[in-house]
Amino acid sequence: LVVADITRAWNRASEFTGHVDNQLNDAGNPHDDIYIDFAQGTHRVHTDEENVTCVGEEVASRIKMYQHVSTDKSMLTHVGTTTRGTDVWIDTRVVEADKVILINAISTHDMAGFGGGRKLILPGVAGFETVQQNHCHALGPTVGSGLNPDAALLKIAGNPVSEDMQEACDMIAPCFLVHSVINAEGEISSMVGGDPYKAWLEGTREIYRMQKVRMKAQTDVTIVSAGGYPKDTNLYQGTKCYTTAEIATKKGGIIITMIEAEDVQEPPAYLGSFKYKNLTEMEEGLRACFTIPLFVAFENLITAMTHTVYIVTRPENFDILRERTHQIPVATVEEAWELAKKQLAEEGKEDYTINVIPQGSAIVPYVEE
């Protein structure tokens, strides 16, 4: 069983992994023949308590559990090369298993279109260099070309990151998939199971039906909230609403966002990514060593340089935001709105349009036509 790691514990897999195990037992597979390999990707290993959080106490007490370490080459097996040139190294325990079942949830994903499914194999149980090669497909062909527009939210067909992941997954050929679909309240809305690709694809359609919100057109101003605690505990998490805001806002428009960021320094890898002098240097750094915190910072900097971003946050965060992120910190929404109105007047915009999005990371806006 390849099970998502602690960073995806919101998937509520602890509530249904036991049912999968029971079905396997009923089919004649004893506990000794079943094991879990956590899909850590490039994340750290779990504590014992986190193992229990992911799969539940009953499962954790009766099934062997292993941690995937992407940098441990002694536990990786080369299974092939994708058509895009990614050398696919996968956790040997997964490669040598007679059957592989994927357990997670389905969500939207900025880079891969949707999460879940093939992502449990790559990056989930892939080697570090394999993950690096795959994720670099999220960038354009040359330095200076920035983000690859095909590696985008909701996009599967023609998405080089997603298609590369799917190729790697097909090399392992999982036999089954069980995924939850989680609603905005964090509850299981539905479940999908069956063929690892077809069931996952049906789940992506369900997520799209749940999260899509129609808008008539992009607007001059978008007021967006990250969604409050715990979605805005830091900038790394809170800025997930920027993708939604960008879709809803005209290029060069104004974004007013609310991110409290009580732990503004966390994670250090994200805030430290703003050390580069300019966008080109940041892109060069990303191509040299691709990390998700650096990629998120790169996306955020592009947003701040193509829009005016007013961020309502704690006053103690102001200096960090001014110095590093090219965003304009303010203490209240009212203050941000006064600055926005002044900017609109200076631009000669009297008949401006506004979108208001209370839960920025929980919806996907789309233009009516």
Where do the language-model regions lie?
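Short glycine-rich or small-residue beta-strand-to-loop segments that form or flank ligand, phosphate
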Residues: L1-W10, Y35-G41, I223-S225
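Structural motif
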Residues: V2, I101-I103, D220-S225, I256, ...
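Histidine-anchored nucleotide/phosphate-binding helix
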Residues: A9-N29, T239-A248
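C-terminal non-catalytic interaction/assembly regions of soluble proteins
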Residues: N25, G238-E369
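An acidic, phosphate/nucleotide-engaging active-site surface
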Residues: V45-G115
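Internal metal/ion-chelating core segments
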Residues: E96-I182
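Membrane-embedded hairpin module used as a gating/binding unit in multi-pass transport
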Residues: G146-Y229
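Active-site segments that bind and position negatively charged phosphate/pyrophosphate groups
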Residues: Y197, L201-D263, C289-I292
